[in-house]
Amino acid sequence: ISVAATDFVMNSARKRNPFALRNYMVGYWKTFGVLSVLSLGALWWMAPWLLAVFGPSYAEGSSVMRLFLVGSLGAHLLRVPYGHLLSAVGRADLNTYVNGAVFLATIPLCFWAIPQWGIMGAAGVMAAMLWVSGGMYALVFEIHLRGQRQD
């Protein structure tokens, strides 16, 4: 998040250059995609041990933690960078629309999943929504770029 915030001014200056903004994302994925997969993979592997530090009853939650890690990967790869890019190009309003749509979809999905699978259902819905929102951000950003003229 801090990198995206640091690059905000640079990306704002490039707001009418779709090629530069797409290249920014490729560079982001080359660096932070690899780092995200490696760090979240390490946490996945260490989940039972990390939770056992808090007591034996927490160790049972490793499957929930792992599900949240899958969702976090979606946030790291799509949701965060595209959300910041939308703000940088002056389209923070699109962030609001995507968040509203995801929120409205999450409510009925949780009402369905929690009675079926309990905490795993809630974790699954939240993890899926991080990926869905990231995909929506990417789609909305691409639509925005295609509407721009090339400088």
Residue ranges and their predicted role:
Residues 32, 65-68, 72, 99-100, ...:
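Residue-level recognition of transmembrane alpha-helices
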Residues 18-19, 26, 45-73:
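Interfacial segments at transmembrane-helix termini and the short loops linking adjacent helices
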Residues 2-6, 46-47, 66, 82, ...:
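Hydrophobic/aromatic residues in alpha-helical transmembrane segments
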Residues 47, 51, 93, 100-135, ...:
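Membrane-interface helix-loop junctions in multi-pass transport and translocation proteins
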